[in-house]
Amino acid sequence: QHTDVALPHYKPEVWTFPRGALCTIDRSWLWPIGPYLFHGIAETHVSHHISSKIPHYNAWEATEALKVKLGEHYKYCDENVFVSLWKNSRACKFIDENDKVAFYRNVHGVPSAVVANGSKDDNSDSGVNLSD
């Protein structure tokens, strides 16, 4: 939920609660077993980060509302959770601590995504380009 090639990391000087709360991803987790056993926490994880006081039985409705509100900024992965785990364990080794907004890099130092806008000194997460 907290580690994915599409999720940025923020240095303290640019971190805000909304940015931090949205640095997670909803995943389909062992459908239909996961939602039943774990009350949908994997499938509604973004709404849990927005407000952890939302009861699990209302998290599905909250997630649907967030999808509408966040639009393209809502992160969801319906890939098999074990495939995602394997891919992310290979692609997400470290982040570059020199960037205010950083994305995971693989073992060769190749970033999973780059910030498309802004200079090296003042980068922003708007305009993110994901690499293959």
What is the meaning of each model-derived region?
Residues 1-132:
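Hydrophobic transmembrane helical bundles of multi-pass organellar membrane proteins
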